[in-house]
Swiss-Prot record:
This is ATP-dependent RNA helicase RhlB. SUPFAM superfamilies: P-loop containing nucleoside triphosphate hydrolases (SSF52540). Belongs to the DEAD box helicase family. RhlB subfamily. The gene is rhlB. It is an enzyme of class 3 (hydrolase). It is found in: Cytoplasm.
Length: 421
């Protein structure tokens, strides 16, 4: 993290449990980010919190620190059973649940608290085996949590801490009934610590969320600016026929170290992947129907640097901690204004600079006015020379080939720059 991303407030300044402070410092966390500095005084005093901050500002560590401190500082309820977790952290996607679990592991190792993970798609028996041995903190998606609860594999009657991460997406995806079902099986709101964190939190969502909280305190960081000030935003207006060639030309120009390309449909993502893989790029594909194990492998390869480009639907836009993403390309402008914020928030994280490039084609240009109204500013427009777009492009690959494009990255200098002056 850069110094500009941190505050003067140190974790050791708070009355945190010593084991929590030790674990944080061992991982190199000394100074708080703004959202952590705002949230911790409240949660340590037992106050419920609804926190809004840009992605990459430390929301996950804010609620994990609060959760571990609370459980270490307060005894479990009397007669707690082995199938009763003490804390429940709910996430909208499998990938985010896995990421939270990974972030929590160093704290669990240092404190002795046991973690459990519950998400759909695969691993049912493996996850259940961990739960049957007893866990203190259960992290998961609502569908699998309800499945385990209905079969009495877990009982929520001993919950002391509840977290909703990416709360707006939880509601947007229609999980409101699931969330309420789970809350009804917990102790009353005033008998537990409740936390909500998200990059965007509408008044509608805030009102719904507060039904399940105890006079929560609303905190936010940089509320006047929905897109990070370290992200350079840029917009092009290509025709549908020139759109793919423009994308490939921009990639040649920018030569990004690590880029995510977002499109609105699975079919479009597969099309983009095919063109880039054929052109020799180390590119991965992440859509909703990719098997869970393969999705996690692709994310790991992208994070390690084995892949340079990730083509994705919005499944990858929320909550994932992928470091050092230098560029985000919106091949399609999203239909949901909030998705624009979450997409470009993959870059410019943790105090770094980032670059977002959006293509307003004939099909999705009508989404632009609502996006610009939502973010509160116009996206700067750049022009290009149609005659200078790349033409020497190979035939795109089909998905009968490996999705992750494991061939070597093309070497040599980028082709000549093709933007008009």
């Amino acid at each position: 993290m850069s110094k500009t991303h941190l505050t003067e407030q140190k974790f050791s300044d708070f009355a945190l449990h010593p084991k929590v402070v030790e674990a944080l410092e061992k991982k190199g966390f000394h100074n708080c980010t703004p959202i952590q500095a705002l949230a911790l005084p409240l949660t340590l005093a037992g106050r419920d919190v609804a926190g809004q901050a840009q992605t990459g500002t430390g929301k996950t560590m804010a609620f994990l620190t609060s959760t571990f401190h609370c459980l270490l500082s307060h005894p479990a309820i009397a007669d707690r059973k082995v199938n009763q977790p003490r804390a429940l952290i709910m996430a909208p996607t499998r990938e985010l649940a896995v990421q939270i679990h990974a972030d929590a592991e160093p704290l669990a190792e240092a404190t002795g608290l046991k973690l459990g993970l519950a998400y759909g798609g695969d691993g049912y028996d493996k996850q259940l085996k961990v739960l049957e041995s007893g866990v203190d903190i259960l992290i998961g998606t609502t569908g699998r949590l309800i499945d385990y609860a209905k079969q009495n594999h877990i009982n929520l009657g001993a919950i002391q801490v509840v977290v909703l991460d990416e709360a707006d997406r939880m509601y947007d995806l229609g999980f409101i009934k699931d969330i309420r079902w789970l809350f009804r099986r917990m102790p009353p709101a005033n008998q537990r610590l409740n936390m909500l964190f998200s990059a965007t939190l509408s008044y509608r969502v805030r009102e719904l969320a507060f039904e399940q909280m105890n006079n929560a305190e609303y905190i936010e960081v940089e509320p006047e600016q929905k897109t990070g000030h370290r992200i350079k935003e840029e917009l092009f207006y290509p025709s549908n026929e020139e759109k793919m060639r423009l994308l490939q030309t921009l990639i040649e120009e920018e030569w990004p170290d690590r880029a995510i390309i977002f499109a609105n449909t699975k079919h479009r993502c597969e099309e983009i992947w095919g063109h880039l893989a054929a052109d020799g790029h180390r590119v991965g594909l992440l859509t909703g129907d990719v098997a869970q194990k393969k999705r996690l492998r692709i994310l790991d390869e992208f994070t390690r640097g084995d892949l340079d480009i990730l083509v994705a639907t919005d499944v990858a836009a929320r909550g994932l901690h992928i470091p050092a993403v230098t560029h985000v390309f919106n091949y399609d402008l999203p239909d949901d204004c909030e998705d624009y914020v979450h997409r470009i928030g993959r870059t410019g994280r943790a105090g770094a600079n980032g670059h977002s490039i959006s293509l307003a084609c004939e099909e999705y240009a009508l989404n632009l006015p609502a996006i610009e109204t939502y973010i509160g500013h116009s996206i700067p427009v750049s022009k290009y020379n149609p005659d200078a777009l790349m033409t020497d492009l190979p035939k795109p690959l089909r998905l009968t080939r490996p999705r992750t494009g494991n061939g070597p990255r093309r070497t040599g200098a980028p082709r000549n720059r093709r933007r008009s002056g």
